[in-house]
């Protein structure tokens, strides 16, 4: 059984997406036990439409929902101990859940997660890892927004955590790791990036295979299993890729409807276009993973639909099933000489 707590009020659409999304995920993974945190008045009728989900869940009424535009500091002051987001995270501390999934305000979710769960021993700052579609399948890119201007040691830690996530998600024994840079030559790039490369290379970590520097176009090619960068450039790369995918989809839609011949051609090529559309569907890779915390936190896109939110739940399910937290702790212990924590410290 995998116990998953949900911030039902999070995201642009709240329970109208979270509840049917959870129902879809339950169809795929019948061994999930959901712990739902939300405002009962908005959720009770929606839950009644999904009897299997209702039977596999416990519901906790919460008086506060964190707004999508709330500042993290305000969300902490107003929602600590009361909001659906806080309570969903704290369910990990209370040993009611193995992972939390929220589509809520990213800044507030990160602030509450750090405050409530704390960072793992040896980790200075957490990272957000994104699953990225590539020509070879999928890769992991981190950090995509949590730590702006990470230093060399933090990039080293990101490499360790990204490698552990790749082993958990892709079941690769020794995933390849590359540092995002402006060129592949050793003399190029910021000093922090060059120093991080030296740290990773000299550490010779058992769980990762250091590839060296990679450039932006290597991400989509799938040159490495894990791409490491700091949060500013990582977030720009993520948003640029999402925008490019939408742009290509619009180009194709316009081209296929421009003339009668194009529409006829589309009929014959529909299967190929459907496969392309599925490959480029952002819902399939929804679910950023907060790494470096004493608990697994999954961030869904705020505007995700039910299928997209279900995909984020899928990511959380896989991370628990494949022992992500234990893998990260073991790698950090080997590198930092620390012992894996016995229990999650309470906030």
From Swiss-Prot:
Its main location: cytoplasm. One of its GO terms (cellular component) is cytoplasm. InterPro entries: FA_synthesis, Phospholipid_synth_PlsX-like. It is an enzyme of class 2 (transferase). It is found in: Cytoplasm. Its EC number is 2.3.1.274. Pathway: Lipid metabolism; phospholipid metabolism. Belongs to the PlsX family. Homodimer. Probably interacts with PlsY. PANTHER family: FATTY ACID/PHOSPHOLIPID SYNTHESIS PROTEIN PLSX, PHOSPHATE ACYLTRANSFERASE. This is Phosphate acyltransferase. The lineage of its organism: Bacteria, Pseudomonadati, Pseudomonadota, Alphaproteobacteria, Hyphomicrobiales.
């Amino acid at each position: 059984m995998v116990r998953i707590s949900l911030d039902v009020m999070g995201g642009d659409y709240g329970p109208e997406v979270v509840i049917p999304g959870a129902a879809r995920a339950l169809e795929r993974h019948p061994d999930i036990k959901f712990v739902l945190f939300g405002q009962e008045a908005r959720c009770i009728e929606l839950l009644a439409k999904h009897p299997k989900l209702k039977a596999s869940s416990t519901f906790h009424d919460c008086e506060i929902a964190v707004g999508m535009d709330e500042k993290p500091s305000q969300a902490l002051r107003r929602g600590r101990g009361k909001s659906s987001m806080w309570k969903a995270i704290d369910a990990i501390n209370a040993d009611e859940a193995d992972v939390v999934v929220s589509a809520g305000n990213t800044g507030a979710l990160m602030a509450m997660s750090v405050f409530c769960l704390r960072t793992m021993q040896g980790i200075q700052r957490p990272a957000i890892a994104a699953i990225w579609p590539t020509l070879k399948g999928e890769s992991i890119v981190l950090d995509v927004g949590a730590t702006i201007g990470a230093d060399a040691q933090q990039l080293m830690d990101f490499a360790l955590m990204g490698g552990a996530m790749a082993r958990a998600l892709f079941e690769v024994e020794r995933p390849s790791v590359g540092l995002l840079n402006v060129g592949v030559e050793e003399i190029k790039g910021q000093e922090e990036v060059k120093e991080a490369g030296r740290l990773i290379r000299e550490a010779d970590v058992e769980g990762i295979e250091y590839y060296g520097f990679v450039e932006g176009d290597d991400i989509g090619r799938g040159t490495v299993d894990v791409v490491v960068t700091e949060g500013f450039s990582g977030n720009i790369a993520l948003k640029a890729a999402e925008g490019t995918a939408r742009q290509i989809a619009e180009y194709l839609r316009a081209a296929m409807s421009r003339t009668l011949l194009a529409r006829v051609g589309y009929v014959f090529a529909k299967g190929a276009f459907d496969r392309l559309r599925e490959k480029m569907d952002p819902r399939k890779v929804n679910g950023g993973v907060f790494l470096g915390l004493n608990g697994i936190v999954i961030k869904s896109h705020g505007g995700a639909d039910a299928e997209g939110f279900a995909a984020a739940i899928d990511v959380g399910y896989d991370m628990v099933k494949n022992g992500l937290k234990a893998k990260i702790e073991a790698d950090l212990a080997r590198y930092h000489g620390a012992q894996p924590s016995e229990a999650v410290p309470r906030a």
